[in-house]
């Protein structure tokens, strides 16, 4: 009956919806020929638990806390969690500025309104000070005034802003239910119902409908629907069906989530997306009694956060769509004030408090404490009052292992220690969404990959030493290319179907991508050896038969990168090394990446080739120019942007077999000699 109610609640949406780019929109609209009969989500809607606990019927608040639990939280705020709560109160955004007036269509404006509602409402329920209640009302009124939740030309009412506002207004309505007038409750409830209907109709199962379960544009809006469903569960007949739909979709979201804790979209998207996974799991557990946390990707998530962080604590190993690369690292660019407000890295590290609490993980708590010492900041500090377990014994970061291998995504991280002066590096050679995805695609035929935030970067590496990011990635791009990474080009071409839009992996068989892998990891006291095979990362039209890279680090001696490359037809092969600032030519065939007072010395050579004549290394130093992300709905249509420089090292003539060798060593920038290590 509830499934029928959802179907009857359908509202026709505008046809002119825009996705991230044209190809992604077409994939979203296309019906899958693999799906026959009833959509798989309907069975999940019937069988998965989504009923509100009987004791919560007719009760407010209930989504995340009850009145009894609020009493306990008020005591925490004055005792064990006093410092955390003071920090949260100092950052209540609804007290610092008015909400944007309608239509509030600037990027992320409505997202902030949603978070501000929840923050101010919760602060009021803990403090009892009416200034927080008045601020929450003001922001809720603003949300009601927005006719469209989101962007009018890009999935209006059904995308990220809708998820944020349903979450904020849903929980705000639930928390403040008894503090609002009858007229206010009616007005807020009617707006919530209207917006939830729009979103539920968009996400409901339809014949042939596919879902990008692992992509944030699915689980962020659907989290908002789930929160609204539990807030309104017994106040509108459609709400139970919304809860069913959300639980069904989340069944697949969790099943397709990372097996090893690594987040494929990149650390910027871990920061942005992970709160919504936690918000749904917490709301669902509190509302229904069902705990969905116990999955390897959540147990291991703190490893991804810890090892992604650079020793400096102000940036990360930035595989995937992450900020603006060299610009952000230099404190420049349009994104820096958002990513580093007042110079503090915004990481949402307090999410690890929740994982530490749930899994009783002293390691996760230790990672969070380490990030806090760097002065990092969170979007929702107020959650720390609920999440932080003051009784949990912390494992300090210094006692945790300083390297980690993520076997499902085939990404490796190593550092000499946990100090700011550590030498650290990372190496990546795996399929965009992990090895488990190939089997899952067979199991879930309605799962549609949307891997645009992952990059064509197999067999690439990032190096950090002496407090400097020496070489690595380019950051978030509208059109990701292999040339943005420290990897290989074949006749100037890179991996997968790069250059055709934001998703370089669209329409590439995952069976081919799944052969991309790290084949050896050896960590010894005297050396670290990583071998990666990226042969099938490249399209068959390029004729690449073999691309195996060995990446070796020996403390005191530096790095050695050895590449074995074979092709079916002669091709010019090019290695790329990136610099945030500049690349300099030291001597004939010798180069350096300069990073302030430090430089990375580069000595390349070709050891063997199919050409009987000696093969020279041809070099070029170029500005690294890319397509920056465009506006919502046209991410691949951004402006051209310069981010650092790149060194291109090529065979002097087409060849079918080559062994490249690069020796990399770190020295002070004022040293004039070239290392022979």
Language-model segments: what does each one mean?
Residues 2-14:
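Bacterial N-terminal signal peptides
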Residues 13-21:
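Bacterial Sec-dependent signal peptides at the C-terminal "C-region" and cleavage site
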Residues 20-84:
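Mature N-terminal, pre-catalytic/accessory segment of carbohydrate-active enzymes
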Residues 35-56, 157-160, 187-217, 454-458, ...:
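Short, charged N-terminal helix-start/capping segments
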Residues 42, 47, 269, 274-677:
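Extended polysaccharide-engagement surfaces of secreted carbohydrate-active enzymes
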Residues 62-73, 77-78, 82-89, 93, ...:
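Aromatic-lined, polymer-binding surfaces characteristic
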């Amino acid at each position: 009956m509830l499934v029928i109610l959802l179907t009857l609640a359908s509202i026709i949406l505008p046809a002119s919806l825009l996705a991230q780019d044209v190809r992604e929109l077409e994939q979203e609209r296309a019906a899958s020929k693999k799906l026959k009969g009833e959509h798989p989500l309907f069975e999940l809607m019937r069988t998965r638990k989504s009923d509100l606990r009987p004791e919560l019927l007719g009760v407010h608040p209930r989504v995340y806390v009850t009145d009894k639990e609020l009493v306990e939280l008020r005591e925490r705020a004055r005792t064990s969690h006093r410092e955390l709560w003071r920090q949260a109160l100092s950052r209540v955004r609804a007290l610092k500025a008015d909400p944007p007036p309608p239509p509030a269509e600037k990027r992320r404006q409505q997202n902030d309104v949603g978070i501000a509602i929840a923050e101010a409402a919760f602060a009021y329920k803990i403090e009892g000070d009416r200034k927080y209640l008045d601020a929450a009302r003001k922001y809720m009124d603003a949300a009601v005034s927005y006719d469209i939740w989101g962007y009018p030309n890009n999935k209006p009412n059904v995308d990220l802003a809708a998820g944020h506002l349903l979450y904020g207004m849903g929980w705000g309505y639930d928390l403040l239910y008894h503090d609002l007038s009858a007229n206010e409750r009616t007005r807020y409830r009617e707006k919530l119902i209207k917006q939830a209907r729009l979103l539920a109709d968009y996400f409901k199962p339809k014949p042939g409908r596919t879902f990008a379960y692992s992509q944030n544009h699915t689980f962020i809006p659907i989290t908002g629907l789930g929160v609204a469903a539990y807030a309104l569960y017994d106040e509108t007949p459609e709400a139970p069906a919304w809860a069913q739909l959300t639980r069904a979709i989340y069944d697949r979201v969790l099943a397709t989530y990372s097996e090893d804790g690594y987040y494929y979209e990149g650390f910027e998207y871990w920061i942005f997306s992970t709160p919504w996974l936690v918000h749904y799991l917490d709301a669902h557990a509190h509302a229904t009694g069902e705990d969905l946390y116990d999955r390897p990707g959540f147990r291991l998530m703190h490893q991804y956060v810890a090892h992604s962080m650079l020793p400096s604590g102000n940036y990360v190993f930035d595989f995937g769509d992450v900020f603006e690369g060299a610009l952000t690292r230099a404190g420049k660019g349009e994104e820096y004030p958002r990513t580093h407000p007042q110079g503090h890295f915004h990481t949402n590290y307090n999410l690890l408090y929740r994982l530490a609490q749930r899994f009783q993980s002293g390691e996760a708590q230790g990672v969070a404490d380490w990030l806090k010492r760097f002065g990092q900041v969170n979007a929702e500090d107020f959650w720390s009052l609920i999440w932080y377990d003051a009784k949990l014994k912390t494992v300090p970061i210094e006692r945790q292992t300083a390297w980690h291998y993520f076997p499902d995504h085939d990404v490796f991280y190593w550092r000499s220690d946990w100090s700011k002066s550590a030498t650290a590096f990372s190496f990546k050679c795996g399929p965009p969404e992990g090895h488990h995805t190939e089997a899952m695609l067979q199991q879930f035929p309605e799962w549609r990959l949307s891997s645009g935030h992952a990059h064509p970067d197999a067999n690439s590496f990032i190096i950090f030493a002496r407090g400097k990011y020496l070489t690595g990635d380019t950051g978030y791009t509208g059109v990701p290319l292999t040339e943005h990474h420290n990897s290989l080009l074949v006749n100037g071409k890179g991996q997968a179907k790069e250059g055709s839009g934001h998703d370089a992996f669209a329409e590439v068989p995952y069976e081919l991508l799944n052969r991309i892998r790290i084949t050896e990891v050896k960590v010894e006291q005297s050396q670290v050896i990583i071998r990666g095979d990226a042969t099938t990362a490249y399209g068959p039209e390029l004729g690449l038969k073999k691309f195996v890279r060995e990446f070796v680090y020996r403390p005191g001696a530096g790095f050695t990168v050895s590449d074995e490359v074979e092709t079916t037809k002669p091709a010019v092969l090019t290695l790329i090394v990136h610099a945030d600032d500049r690349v300099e030519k030291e001597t004939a065939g010798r180069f350096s990446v300069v990073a302030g007072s430090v430089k990375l010395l580069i000595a390349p050579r070709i050891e063997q080739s199919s050409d009987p004549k000696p093969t020279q290394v041809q070099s070029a130093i170029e500005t690294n120019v890319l397509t920056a992300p465009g506006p919502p709905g046209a991410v691949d249509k951004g402006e051209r942007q310069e981010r650092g420089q790149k060194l291109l090292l090529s065979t002097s003539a087409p060849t079918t077999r080559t062994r490249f060798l690069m020796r990399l060593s770190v020295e002070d920038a004022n040293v004039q000699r070239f290392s022979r290590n």
